Swiss-Prot record:
Residues 58-85, 211-260 are annotated as: Disordered. This is Repressor of RNA polymerase III transcription MAF1 homolog. Residues 218-235 have a biased composition (Acidic residues). Residues 61-76 have a biased composition (Polar residues). One of its GO terms (molecular function) is RNA polymerase III core binding. There is a cross-link at residue 35 (Glycyl lysine isopeptide (Lys-Gly) (interchain with G-Cter in SUMO1 and SUMO2)). GO terms for biological process: negative regulation of transcription by RNA polymerase III. Residues 251-260 have a biased composition (Basic and acidic residues). The gene is MAF1. It is found in: Nucleus; Cytoplasm.
Length: 260
């Protein structure tokens, strides 16, 4: 998997990291090519030892609706086939796992992820509404201006009408967003088979009482400070003064909202 440059996504990602006062929103959208090379080919050969690429793997029911899997036993289209019957090929499953590995490396390794940790979403409109509701409830009016820009950029990159949409819903032990204070999170894959491309949209909300941007900034400052001291010892030069920039915040106008 190769991360594809996208200036529109970079601009949007800067607006998806938001401190709301009571929570911290961290989101990103990334585009990946499914063309395998190098390590991907080696990993794919190992992956195929457990089954051929065309073999279908059973997926878990979608969780977009907020209902538990047991309450999603039947689809709207009929009584015989429900979300539990959703499947994908092992090759597609490999693409999803490889995308996670590329996006979260080096902090996490998803090589042992299994098909039951993924779901195929029922429709584009369902996913769009779920994303919109999560982000609008978090940042309110500020998301109204970002929403059309966000979805237009995704559509231009991946052609949403042609996509199969998957989500990653792991157990707490495997969830990279399962830390204390996590309020909600989502991980969506927009897969266009024709383009051989995946757009990965990941976002989480962390309680402000358990996570502060300054903590990450202090850790970075300590690392940089140690490097500066080492350089000074080697060169005998003086250090430069500086400090972390204040994180950008969105306007905090909070009103109740109901997503339709």
């Amino acid at each position: 998997m190769k991360l594809l440059e996208n200036s529109s996504f970079e601009a949007i990602n800067s607006q998806l990291t938001v401190e709301t006062g009571d929570a911290h929103i961290i989101g990103r959208i990334e585009s990946y090519s499914c063309k395998m090379a190098g390590d991907d080919k080696h990993m794919f050969k190992q992956f195929c030892q457990e089954g051929q690429p065309h073999v279908l793997e059973a997926l878990s029911p979608p969780q977009t609706s907020g209902l538990s899997p047991s309450r999603l036993s039947k689809s709207q289209g009929g009584e015989d086939e429900g979300p539990l019957s959703d499947k994908c090929s092992r090759k597609t499953l490999f693409y999803l796992i490889a995308t996670l590995n590329e996006s979260f490396r080096p902090d996490y390794d998803f090589s042992t992820a299994r098909s039951h940790e993924f779901s195929r979403e029922p429709s584009l409109s369902w996913v769009v509404n779920a994303v919109n509701c999560s982000l609008f409830s978090a940042v309110r009016e500020d998301f109204k201006a970002l929403k059309p820009q966000l979805w237009n950029a995704v559509d231009e990159e991946i052609c949403l009408a042609e996509c199969d949409i998957y989500s990653y819903n792991p157990d707490l032990d495997s969830d990279p967003f399962g830390e204390d204070g996590s309020l909600w999170s989502f991980n969506y894959f927009f897969y266009n088979k024709r383009l051989k491309r995946i757009v990965f949209f990941s976002c989480r909300s962390i309680s402000g009482s358990t996570y502060t941007p300054s903590e990450a900034g202090n850790e970075l400052d300590m690392e940089l400070g140690e490097e500066d001291e080492e350089e000074e010892e080697e060169s005998g030069g003086g250090g430069s003064e500086g400090g972390p920039e204040e994180p950008g915040t969105m306007e905090e106008d909070r009103v109740p909202v109901i997503c339709m």
